[in-house]
Amino acid sequence: MKKTLAFLMAGAMAAAALVGCSAKNDTSSAASDAAAPTAATADGDWDYISGKGEMTIGITYFEPMNYIGEDGKLTGFETDFATAVCKELGVEPKFQEIEWDSKEIELNAKTIDCIWNGLTITAEREANMSITLPYMSNKQVMVVKAENADKYKTAADVKGAKVVAEAGSAGEEVAKGEDFFKEATYTPADSQAKCLLEVKSGTSDIAIIDYVMTIGTLRAGSDYSDLKMVEGQDFSPEVYGIAFRKGSDASQKVSDTIVKLYNDGKLQEIAKKYNLEEQIPKINANAE
Protein backbone atom coordinates (compact mmCIF):
# COMPACT_ATOMS: atom_id res chain seq x y z
CA MET A 1 0.00 0.00 0.00
CA LYS A 2 2.98 2.27 -0.36
CA LYS A 3 4.18 4.11 -3.40
CA THR A 4 7.36 2.28 -4.24
CA LEU A 5 8.63 3.42 -7.60
CA ALA A 6 10.46 6.69 -7.97
CA PHE A 7 9.16 7.35 -11.45
CA LEU A 8 5.60 7.05 -10.16
CA MET A 9 6.35 9.59 -7.46
CA ALA A 10 7.76 11.88 -10.11
CA GLY A 11 4.61 11.37 -12.14
CA ALA A 12 2.48 12.24 -9.12
CA MET A 13 4.43 15.44 -8.62
CA ALA A 14 4.10 16.33 -12.28
CA ALA A 15 0.39 15.70 -12.20
CA ALA A 16 0.06 17.76 -9.04
CA ALA A 17 1.90 20.62 -10.73
CA LEU A 18 -0.46 20.48 -13.68
CA VAL A 19 -3.57 20.64 -11.59
CA GLY A 20 -2.24 23.14 -9.06
CA CYS A 21 -2.33 22.87 -5.30
CA SER A 22 -6.10 22.84 -4.86
CA ALA A 23 -7.89 19.54 -5.44
CA LYS A 24 -10.38 19.93 -2.63
CA ASN A 25 -13.55 19.45 -4.64
CA ASP A 26 -14.46 17.26 -7.58
CA THR A 27 -16.40 20.17 -9.04
CA SER A 28 -13.34 22.40 -9.23
CA SER A 29 -11.46 23.22 -12.39
CA ALA A 30 -8.41 21.50 -10.87
CA ALA A 31 -10.28 18.20 -10.91
CA SER A 32 -11.10 18.73 -14.57
CA ASP A 33 -7.48 19.49 -15.39
CA ALA A 34 -6.33 16.40 -13.52
CA ALA A 35 -8.12 14.15 -16.00
CA ALA A 36 -6.60 15.71 -19.09
CA PRO A 37 -3.01 14.39 -19.20
CA THR A 38 -3.88 10.72 -19.64
CA ALA A 39 -7.11 10.84 -21.64
CA ALA A 40 -5.33 10.51 -24.98
CA THR A 41 -3.27 7.50 -23.91
CA ALA A 42 -5.74 5.59 -21.72
CA ASP A 43 -7.10 3.46 -24.59
CA GLY A 44 -4.31 0.98 -23.93
CA ASP A 45 -4.92 0.96 -20.19
CA TRP A 46 -5.93 -2.69 -20.06
CA ASP A 47 -2.72 -3.76 -21.82
CA TYR A 48 -0.80 -1.71 -19.27
CA ILE A 49 -2.62 -3.31 -16.32
CA SER A 50 -2.58 -6.86 -17.65
CA GLY A 51 1.07 -6.46 -18.63
CA LYS A 52 1.92 -5.76 -14.99
CA GLY A 53 -0.14 -8.73 -13.93
CA GLU A 54 -1.80 -6.68 -11.22
CA MET A 55 -4.41 -3.95 -10.79
CA THR A 56 -3.42 -1.27 -8.30
CA ILE A 57 -6.61 -0.29 -6.51
CA GLY A 58 -6.90 3.00 -4.63
CA ILE A 59 -8.81 2.68 -1.37
CA THR A 60 -9.43 4.32 1.97
CA TYR A 61 -10.23 2.34 5.09
CA PHE A 62 -13.84 2.23 6.17
CA GLU A 63 -15.95 -0.66 7.36
CA PRO A 64 -17.66 -2.58 5.80
CA MET A 65 -15.91 -1.73 2.50
CA ASN A 66 -12.17 -2.02 3.23
CA TYR A 67 -10.85 -2.59 6.74
CA ILE A 68 -8.40 -4.68 8.74
CA GLY A 69 -10.07 -7.78 10.17
CA GLU A 70 -9.38 -9.54 13.45
CA ASP A 71 -6.78 -11.68 11.68
CA GLY A 72 -4.83 -8.56 10.72
CA LYS A 73 -5.65 -8.92 7.03
CA LEU A 74 -7.47 -6.53 4.72
CA THR A 75 -11.10 -7.52 4.31
CA GLY A 76 -14.49 -6.00 3.46
CA PHE A 77 -17.05 -5.89 0.68
CA GLU A 78 -14.93 -3.89 -1.75
CA THR A 79 -11.87 -6.02 -0.95
CA ASP A 80 -13.71 -9.27 -1.71
CA PHE A 81 -15.52 -7.80 -4.71
CA ALA A 82 -12.35 -6.42 -6.30
CA THR A 83 -10.55 -9.71 -5.64
CA ALA A 84 -13.34 -11.63 -7.40
CA VAL A 85 -13.27 -9.28 -10.41
CA CYS A 86 -9.48 -9.47 -10.68
CA LYS A 87 -9.61 -13.26 -10.52
CA GLU A 88 -12.00 -13.30 -13.47
CA LEU A 89 -9.70 -10.95 -15.39
CA GLY A 90 -6.53 -12.88 -14.62
CA VAL A 91 -4.70 -10.21 -12.63
CA GLU A 92 -3.81 -9.81 -8.97
CA PRO A 93 -5.40 -7.03 -6.89
CA LYS A 94 -2.95 -4.69 -5.18
CA PHE A 95 -4.71 -2.49 -2.65
CA GLN A 96 -3.13 0.89 -1.99
CA GLU A 97 -4.31 3.43 0.55
CA ILE A 98 -4.82 6.94 -0.84
CA GLU A 99 -5.91 10.35 0.36
CA TRP A 100 -9.46 10.62 -0.95
CA ASP A 101 -9.13 14.30 -1.74
CA SER A 102 -6.20 13.53 -4.09
CA LYS A 103 -7.72 10.48 -5.79
CA GLU A 104 -7.74 11.87 -9.34
CA ILE A 105 -4.14 13.04 -9.09
CA GLU A 106 -3.14 9.56 -7.92
CA LEU A 107 -5.11 7.99 -10.78
CA ASN A 108 -3.65 10.12 -13.54
CA ALA A 109 -0.12 9.78 -12.17
CA LYS A 110 -0.56 5.99 -12.46
CA THR A 111 0.25 5.42 -8.82
CA ILE A 112 -3.10 3.60 -8.90
CA ASP A 113 -5.05 2.07 -11.78
CA CYS A 114 -8.54 2.70 -10.41
CA ILE A 115 -10.52 4.16 -7.53
CA TRP A 116 -12.57 1.36 -5.99
CA ASN A 117 -13.89 2.46 -2.62
CA GLY A 118 -17.47 3.65 -2.54
CA LEU A 119 -17.00 6.22 -5.30
CA THR A 120 -20.24 8.10 -5.99
CA ILE A 121 -20.99 8.47 -9.70
CA THR A 122 -21.55 12.12 -10.65
CA ALA A 123 -21.65 13.95 -13.97
CA GLU A 124 -18.48 15.83 -13.03
CA ARG A 125 -16.61 12.63 -12.27
CA GLU A 126 -17.84 11.00 -15.47
CA ALA A 127 -16.45 13.97 -17.39
CA ASN A 128 -13.03 13.45 -15.82
CA MET A 129 -12.81 9.67 -15.51
CA SER A 130 -14.13 6.49 -17.13
CA ILE A 131 -16.51 4.92 -14.62
CA THR A 132 -18.05 1.45 -14.68
CA LEU A 133 -21.72 0.70 -14.46
CA PRO A 134 -23.24 1.12 -10.97
CA TYR A 135 -22.96 -1.81 -8.59
CA MET A 136 -24.30 -0.43 -5.29
CA SER A 137 -26.78 2.18 -4.08
CA ASN A 138 -26.09 4.57 -1.22
CA LYS A 139 -27.17 7.82 0.40
CA GLN A 140 -25.69 10.35 2.80
CA VAL A 141 -26.82 10.30 6.42
CA MET A 142 -26.16 12.12 9.67
CA VAL A 143 -24.43 10.35 12.55
CA VAL A 144 -24.50 11.82 16.06
CA LYS A 145 -23.99 10.72 19.64
CA ALA A 146 -26.77 8.32 20.62
CA GLU A 147 -28.21 10.75 23.17
CA ASN A 148 -28.60 13.36 20.39
CA ALA A 149 -30.35 11.07 17.89
CA ASP A 150 -33.64 12.99 18.21
CA LYS A 151 -32.07 16.43 18.45
CA TYR A 152 -31.39 17.23 14.77
CA LYS A 153 -34.64 16.82 12.86
CA THR A 154 -34.93 20.19 11.11
CA ALA A 155 -32.67 22.87 9.66
CA ALA A 156 -33.45 25.01 12.69
CA ASP A 157 -32.16 22.24 14.95
CA VAL A 158 -28.88 22.16 13.02
CA LYS A 159 -28.29 25.92 13.30
CA GLY A 160 -24.91 26.47 14.95
CA ALA A 161 -24.06 22.77 15.02
CA LYS A 162 -20.54 21.64 14.14
CA VAL A 163 -20.68 19.42 11.05
CA VAL A 164 -17.87 17.27 9.67
CA ALA A 165 -17.54 15.32 6.41
CA GLU A 166 -14.73 13.76 4.41
CA ALA A 167 -12.98 16.26 2.14
CA GLY A 168 -13.83 15.71 -1.52
CA SER A 169 -16.73 13.38 -0.72
CA ALA A 170 -20.44 13.33 -1.44
CA GLY A 171 -20.90 14.10 2.24
CA GLU A 172 -18.94 17.31 1.83
CA GLU A 173 -21.15 18.30 -1.11
CA VAL A 174 -24.19 17.78 1.13
CA ALA A 175 -22.67 19.80 3.98
CA LYS A 176 -21.82 22.68 1.66
CA GLY A 177 -24.77 22.54 -0.72
CA GLU A 178 -27.88 21.51 1.20
CA ASP A 179 -29.98 24.31 2.69
CA PHE A 180 -30.51 22.01 5.68
CA PHE A 181 -26.93 22.77 6.78
CA LYS A 182 -26.58 26.39 5.63
CA GLU A 183 -26.47 27.74 9.20
CA ALA A 184 -24.22 24.99 10.54
CA THR A 185 -20.44 25.27 10.86
CA TYR A 186 -18.65 22.90 8.49
CA THR A 187 -15.15 21.44 8.92
CA PRO A 188 -13.62 18.81 6.57
CA ALA A 189 -11.76 15.70 7.72
CA ASP A 190 -9.49 13.48 5.65
CA SER A 191 -11.53 10.28 6.09
CA GLN A 192 -15.00 9.12 7.07
CA ALA A 193 -13.51 7.22 10.00
CA LYS A 194 -12.06 10.48 11.32
CA CYS A 195 -15.49 12.09 10.94
CA LEU A 196 -16.89 9.50 13.35
CA LEU A 197 -13.99 10.06 15.75
CA GLU A 198 -14.75 13.79 15.69
CA VAL A 199 -18.32 13.12 16.80
CA LYS A 200 -17.30 10.48 19.34
CA SER A 201 -14.82 12.88 20.94
CA GLY A 202 -17.29 15.77 20.95
CA THR A 203 -15.22 17.92 18.59
CA SER A 204 -18.09 17.83 16.07
CA ASP A 205 -21.82 17.38 16.58
CA ILE A 206 -22.77 15.75 13.27
CA ALA A 207 -20.88 13.59 10.80
CA ILE A 208 -22.24 13.26 7.27
CA ILE A 209 -21.15 9.88 5.95
CA ASP A 210 -22.16 7.08 3.59
CA TYR A 211 -25.15 5.05 4.73
CA VAL A 212 -23.28 1.84 3.90
CA MET A 213 -20.61 2.81 6.43
CA THR A 214 -23.17 2.91 9.23
CA ILE A 215 -24.05 -0.73 8.52
CA GLY A 216 -20.57 -1.84 9.45
CA THR A 217 -19.51 0.68 12.07
CA LEU A 218 -22.50 1.47 14.29
CA ARG A 219 -23.34 -2.11 15.25
CA ALA A 220 -23.52 -3.20 18.90
CA GLY A 221 -20.11 -3.94 20.33
CA SER A 222 -18.23 -1.81 17.80
CA ASP A 223 -15.98 1.13 18.65
CA TYR A 224 -18.81 3.44 17.57
CA SER A 225 -21.77 1.74 19.25
CA ASP A 226 -22.33 4.96 21.23
CA LEU A 227 -23.14 6.78 17.97
CA LYS A 228 -26.39 6.61 16.04
CA MET A 229 -27.73 7.50 12.62
CA VAL A 230 -30.42 10.20 12.60
CA GLU A 231 -33.57 8.50 11.32
CA GLY A 232 -35.79 10.14 8.73
CA GLN A 233 -33.14 12.50 7.37
CA ASP A 234 -31.04 11.35 4.45
CA PHE A 235 -29.56 13.15 1.48
CA SER A 236 -28.15 12.66 -2.00
CA PRO A 237 -29.40 9.25 -3.22
CA GLU A 238 -26.50 7.90 -5.24
CA VAL A 239 -24.81 4.89 -6.77
CA TYR A 240 -21.23 3.64 -6.65
CA GLY A 241 -18.95 2.89 -9.58
CA ILE A 242 -15.27 2.11 -10.16
CA ALA A 243 -13.26 4.92 -11.74
CA PHE A 244 -10.43 4.49 -14.25
CA ARG A 245 -8.44 7.05 -16.21
CA LYS A 246 -10.47 8.97 -18.79
CA GLY A 247 -10.84 6.90 -21.96
CA SER A 248 -9.60 3.72 -20.28
CA ASP A 249 -10.66 0.46 -21.93
CA ALA A 250 -10.26 -1.23 -18.53
CA SER A 251 -13.54 0.34 -17.40
CA GLN A 252 -15.56 -1.73 -19.89
CA LYS A 253 -13.60 -4.87 -19.00
CA VAL A 254 -14.56 -4.45 -15.36
CA SER A 255 -18.17 -3.54 -16.20
CA ASP A 256 -18.52 -6.75 -18.21
CA THR A 257 -17.12 -8.72 -15.29
CA ILE A 258 -19.53 -7.05 -12.84
CA VAL A 259 -22.42 -8.20 -15.03
CA LYS A 260 -21.04 -11.74 -15.04
CA LEU A 261 -20.62 -11.83 -11.26
CA TYR A 262 -24.13 -10.46 -10.80
CA ASN A 263 -25.64 -13.03 -13.16
CA ASP A 264 -23.71 -15.79 -11.38
CA GLY A 265 -24.97 -14.57 -8.00
CA LYS A 266 -21.42 -14.01 -6.75
CA LEU A 267 -21.84 -10.26 -6.26
CA GLN A 268 -24.98 -10.79 -4.19
CA GLU A 269 -23.20 -13.47 -2.16
CA ILE A 270 -20.35 -11.10 -1.29
CA ALA A 271 -22.81 -8.31 -0.41
CA LYS A 272 -24.79 -10.60 1.90
CA LYS A 273 -21.62 -11.46 3.83
CA TYR A 274 -21.41 -7.79 4.84
CA ASN A 275 -25.18 -7.13 5.24
CA LEU A 276 -25.22 -5.07 2.05
CA GLU A 277 -27.47 -7.23 -0.12
CA GLU A 278 -30.27 -4.63 -0.11
CA GLN A 279 -27.88 -2.08 -1.60
CA ILE A 280 -27.22 -4.10 -4.78
CA PRO A 281 -29.31 -2.75 -7.70
CA LYS A 282 -30.52 -4.78 -10.64
CA ILE A 283 -27.56 -5.01 -13.00
CA ASN A 284 -27.56 -5.78 -16.71
CA ALA A 285 -25.26 -5.29 -19.66
CA ASN A 286 -27.19 -2.19 -20.78
CA ALA A 287 -26.99 -0.47 -17.40
CA GLU A 288 -24.24 1.99 -18.35
Predicted regions and their residues:
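Short helices/loops that flank or line small-molecule/ion binding pockets
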Residues: 87-88, 96-97, 101-114, 128-130, ...
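Ligand-binding clefts/hinges and TM-proximal coupling segments of bilobed small-molecule sensing domains
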Residues: 39-43, 170-187, 225-230, 258-288
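Extracytoplasmic small-molecule ligand-binding "clamshell" domains
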Residues: 39-118
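Short beta-strand->loop
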Residues: 130-137, 187, 224-236, 246, ...
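A ligand-binding cleft/hinge motif common to bilobed small-molecule-binding domains
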Residues: 102, 119-127, 174-177, 200-201, ...
